[in-house]
Swiss-Prot record:
It is a single-pass type II membrane protein. Residues 38-66 form a coiled coil. It is found in: Cell membrane. It comes from Buchnera aphidicola subsp. Schizaphis graminum (strain Sg). Residues 1-3 are cytoplasmic. This is Cell division protein FtsB. InterPro entries: Cell_div_FtsB, FtsL/DivIC.
Length: 66
């Protein structure tokens, strides 16, 4: 019975390590999540810039036509 307890504790420890610091674990998830937030902000900034450029092009095209 004592060996079973030791084995189960070791198994629990190993699973927790895998969950937290293993490949695709929680720490990896947190890093990727932060990168996604930064990239979304960059994408929003680029979208605003693109919209401004589109408006400027349309304004210039209208100025040429008139």
């Amino acid at each position: 019975m004592k060996m079973l307890k030791i084995f189960l504790l070791f198994l629990l420890f190993w699973l927790q390590c895998s969950l937290w610091i293993g490949k695709n674990g929680i720490l990896d998830y947190i890093k990727i999540y932060k990168k996604i937030i930064v990239q979304k902000k960059k994408n929003e900034d680029f979208q605003i810039r693109n919209n401004q450029l589109i408006l400027e092009i349309e304004r210039l095209n209208n100025a040429i036509k008139n």
